[in-house]
Curated annotation (Swiss-Prot):
Disulphide bridges: none
Signal peptide limits: none
Source domain of life: Bacteria
Name of the coding gene: der
Domain KH-like: 350-434
Protein name as annotated: GTPase Der
Subunit structure: Associates with the 50S ribosomal subunit.
Length: 443
């Protein structure tokens, strides 16, 4: 399982800049998706062979007792408690503040490794910048510059030092792992209870991680599934009750561990930033996806149409996924939803032969050639599969690294149609043929 690094600190110390620096390796994958939210709070990173997750908690005000700042502090404290390591960001130019000391008092009581990152240290003597932050009592401070990338690698190496490299093959189960994620009170527990009651299975708690994600084995239509739940469910007889609280870390880890994610959205509430952030993370993770719009039965015809339009506008970057309008309580639409889970899983694991991929590519180019880039027109020549879960298609040719974003989307749409890849993100990588005369020209 990927370790989770949580960034904490008072407002305006550069946490977001550090977050962008730590997650830059994945930004390019989703940068050309229209409508994608850029205000990320959760992301992926990788140092060598060690992948990790990053959570940016926003400004931490631990002493505020009410209002939105109190709610932010509560969420931050929960993320801290569930983190694998904490990076405490302070401002080297402002120096040590009473606010920093308040946060340090909180962090000293947490049984997690804490690494103090003294940001904005560019052009300054690192020893002098670090000196006053020893007073925090959280170990050796580390001078960095998030804006310039200075000291970042060493900081992350220390944070990840105690975590092993991941196993080569993490997918060892015959069961399809389905994560059900969404905001509190959206109906995750109701959905699981309805599914379990429908199948008349005896469910059990299986705390599989230090964060006690709950895994529920069940069978449907002769196929085995594992439901990964983040709602804090506990067994009561043959049904479950839930006190739903939103846990960032549990949600991110359950997405990472899943084959397919069901993102639940409340039809009777507006699509929130939290919904969009989680949808963005699912896309970054490359997980197959089904969107379940719950409590649909409580809307009249006019409100349903308005809700559809809002969903299309706010979640348009999820156009590869099937949307299902359901009632988890009344078991309306769940059969079709689970058929989409199966088809999304099949799409994510699809095997595509090189000859057929190449035929589809050549036909697509014949119908619509790439636009010229300067004096040259990119010439895609053949394609092969580079991976699955999500499917990766590698396109080779001359100057193909110069194709436009719109042409990339055209090819993605073409491959999706040809191979029935609905329900899964699709990555297309372009590899430009090396000019055999390039080295000779230099001699």
């Amino acid at each position: 399982m990927k370790p989770t690094l949580v960034l904490v600190g008072r407002p305006n110390v550069g946490k977001s800049t550090l977050f962008n620096r730590l997650t830059k390796s994945r930004d390019a994958i989703v940068a050309d998706m229209p409508g994608l939210t850029r205000d990320r709070h959760y992301g992926h990173g990788k140092l060598g062979k060690k992948p990790y997750l990053v959570v940016d908690t926003g400004g931490f005000e631990p002493l505020v007792k009410e209002g939105i700042l109190h709610e932010m502090a509560r969420q931050t404290e929960q993320a801290i408690a569930e983190a694998d390591a904490i990076i405490f960001v302070v401002d080297g130019r402002s120096g040590l503040t009473p606010h920093d000391k308040e946060i340090a008092n909180k962090l000293r009581r947490i049984d997690r490794p804490v690494f103090v990152a003294v940001n904005k240290a560019e052009g300054m003597n690192s020893g002098m910048v670090e000196a006053e932050f020893h007073e925090l009592g959280l170990g050796e401070p580390n001078a960095i510059s998030a804006a310039h990338g200075e000291g970042i690698r060493g900081l992350v190496e220390m944070a990840l030092e105690s975590f092993p490299e991941p196993e080569e093959d993490e997918w060892h189960s015959d069961s399809v792992r389905v994560a059900i994620v969404g905001r509190p009170n959206v109906g995750k527990s109701t959905l699981i209870n309805t599914l379990l009651g429908e199948e008349r299975v005896i469910a059990f708690d299986a705390p599989g991680t230090t964060r006690d994600s709950i895994e529920i084995d069940f069978e449907r239509g002769g196929r085995k599934y594992v439901l990964v739940d983040t709602a804090g469910m506990r067994k009561r007889g043959k049904v479950f009750e839930s006190i739903e609280k939103f846990s960032v870390v549990k949600t991110l880890q359950s997405i990472e561990d899943a084959n397919v994610v069901i993102l639940m959205v409340d039809a009777q509430a507006d699509v929130s930033d939290q919904d969009a952030h989680i949808a963005d993370f699912i896309l970054q993770s490359g997980r197959a996806l089904v969107v379940a719009v719950n409590k649909w039965d409580g809307l009249d015809a006019y409100t349903r149409e308005q809700t559809r339009q809002i969903l299309q506008r706010k979640l348009k970057f999820l156009d590869f996924a099937k949307f299902h309008f359901i009632s988890a309580r009344d078991n309306i639409g769940l059969g079709n939803m689970f058929r989409s889970v199966d088809s999304a899983y099949a799409a994510a694991m699809a095997k595509m032969t090189t000859p057929r991929l190449t035929r589809v590519l050549i036909d697509a180019v014949a119908k619509q050639a790439p636009a010229k880039h300067g004096l040259f027109r990119p010439k895609p020549r053949y394609a092969h599969q580079g991976g699955s879960n999500p499917p990766i298609i590698v396109v080779h040719g001359n100057a193909v690294d110069q194709v436009t974003d719109s042409y990339r989307r055209y090819l993605e749409h073409t491959f999706r149609e040809a191979f029935k890849l609905q329900g899964t993100p699709l990555r297309i990588q372009f590899v430009t043929a090396k000019n055999p005369f390039a080295d000779k020209d230099k001699k």
